[in-house]
């Protein structure tokens, strides 16, 4: 079994501190949080990817998973109008590309709250459409997606293993991880 350090808790430190601590405490890899100031998708230019690569080389700790910050406005693909959905999809597709560019093999994401006006059928259709599009991009980039359940306070879409299993059954792809759900 390998243990990874999730960098979200380091958002008030330089990213290098997370790598340094991961090495010092014996972690096997980094799960890179895609939030400001370290690796926010829209700011993670080629220079940002190079900085992550420099830290990987310096500390000999790979980034195995990228977790882009999303689900809050404007990047929640489960709510809003068509423009917000497209914007959210573009954002997550860029995150998949950055995952591959950093040499990470996995990207963790979740389904945000769908609001209180959508029917169960509308939620299911939007989720399936979203997963199909993201999986297609992941297949092109050789990235495995991990879909994370959220709490009932964060989402009304996937909040437990039964919801997760139904979601995973909607899209058949080796790039949508079914093993990391427990």
Regions found by a protein language model. Name each.
Residues 14-18, 44-48, 119, 123-126, ...:
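Residues at alpha-helix caps and immediate loop-helix transition turns in enzyme cores, especially N-
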Residues 29, 36, 125-182:
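Acidic/histidine-rich catalytic cores of soluble enzymes
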Residues 40, 117, 155:
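Glycine/Thr-rich phosphate-binding loops of Rossmann-like dinucleotide-binding domains
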Residues 64-74, 108-114, 152-156:
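Substrate-binding cleft and catalytic face of glycoside hydrolase catalytic domains
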């Amino acid at each position: 079994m390998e243990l990874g350090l999730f960098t979200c808790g380091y958002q008030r430190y330089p990213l290098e501190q997370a790598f340094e601590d991961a090495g010092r405490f014996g972690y096997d890899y980094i799960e890179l949080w895609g939030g400001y100031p370290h690796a926010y998708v829209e700011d993670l230019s080629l220079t940002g990817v190079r900085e992550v690569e420099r830290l990987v080389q310096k500390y000999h700790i790979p980034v195995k998973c990228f977790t882009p910050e999303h689900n809050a406005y404007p990047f929640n693909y489960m709510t809003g109008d068509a423009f917000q959905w497209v914007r959210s999809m573009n954002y997550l597709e860029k995150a998949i590309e950055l995952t591959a560019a950093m040499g990470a093999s996995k990207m963790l994401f979740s389904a945000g709250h769908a609001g209180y006006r959508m029917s169960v059928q509308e939620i299911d259709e939007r989720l399936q459409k979203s997963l199909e599009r993201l999986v297609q991009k992941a297949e092109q980039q050789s990235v495995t997606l991990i879909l994370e359940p959220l709490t009932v306070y964060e989402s009304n879409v996937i909040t437990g293993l039964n919801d997760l299993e139904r979601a995973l059954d909607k899209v058949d792809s080796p790039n949508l991880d079914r093993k990391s759900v427990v």
